[in-house]
């Protein structure tokens, strides 16, 4: 999914890219469209409310940022086959995927942890080895990987700080102390 349109805005503004963004969220769709319009980039970016499995056409590049974790392990082959089908010959995909250590994957996938139970129900992190298998099965070439776990820890810390700063506004929307504790735990996880 295109999320809130941040990457689409960056790619359109900085690189002149023509963007097709997809999402299942009406709220994200409205926000992304407004964001792009506000930046004067509407001619470069279009957004659609559609499931990735229903997208047609072919693209020069595909970017997927932390969406894969939400598709569920049973849909991993579908995801990679769709990426392959949507790529023009000779084109590329950049996939930002949160992974779990190879040695922890088998035990992790057998029972839900805190994040799977309370934050991202149905979510499943792949291991690096599991990703390589899925790439191979879809006949996609896995070229490179980059790990930035320490950067993500800083991101979570910044999100926690922002969450606490905005708590009065969040609470005013009807969210209770249990919700606050749950998200603080996640952001310190």
Annotated model-derived regions:
Residues 6-15:
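Conserved SAM-binding loop of SAM-dependent methyltransferases across substrates and taxa
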Residues 99-189:
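Substrate-binding/catalytic lobe of Class I Rossmann-like enzymes that use SAM or dcSAM, i.e.
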Residues 18-23:
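Conserved SAM-binding motif I beta-strand of class I
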Residues 90-98:
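Conserved beta-strand signature within the Rossmann-like core of class I S-adenosyl-L-methionine
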Residues 32-33:
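Conserved SAM-binding loop
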Residues 77-89:
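A short glycine-rich, Lys/Arg-flanked "PGG" loop and its adjoining helix->strand segment in the class I
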Residues 53-62:
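A short acidic, Gly/Pro-enriched loop at the edge of an enzyme's catalytic core
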Residues 39-52:
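Conserved SAM-binding strand-loop segment of SAM-dependent methyltransferases
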């Amino acid at each position: 999914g295109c999320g809130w349109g941040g990457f689409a805005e960056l790619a359109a503004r900085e690189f002149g890219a023509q963007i097709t963004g997809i999402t299942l969220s009406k709220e994200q769709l409205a926000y992304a469209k407004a964001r792009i319009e506000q930046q004067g980039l509407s001619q470069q970016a279009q957004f659609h409310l559609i499931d990735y499995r229903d997208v047609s056409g072919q693209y020069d590049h595909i970017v997927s940022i932390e969406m894969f974790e939400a598709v569920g392990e049973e849909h991993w082959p579908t995801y990679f086959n769709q990426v392959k089908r949507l790529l023009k010959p000779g084109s590329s995909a950049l996939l930002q995927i949160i992974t779990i250590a190879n040695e922890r994957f088998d035990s992790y996938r057998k029972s839900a942890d805190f994040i799977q139970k309370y934050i991202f129900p149905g979510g499943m992190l792949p291991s690096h080895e599991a990703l390589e298998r899925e790439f191979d099965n879809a006949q996609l070439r896995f070229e490179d990987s980059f790990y930035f776990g320490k950067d993500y820890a800083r991101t979570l810390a910044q999100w926690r700080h922002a969450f606490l700063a905005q708590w009065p506004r969040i609470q005013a929307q009807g969210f209770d102390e249990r919700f606050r504790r749950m998200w603080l735990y996640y952001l310190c996880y």
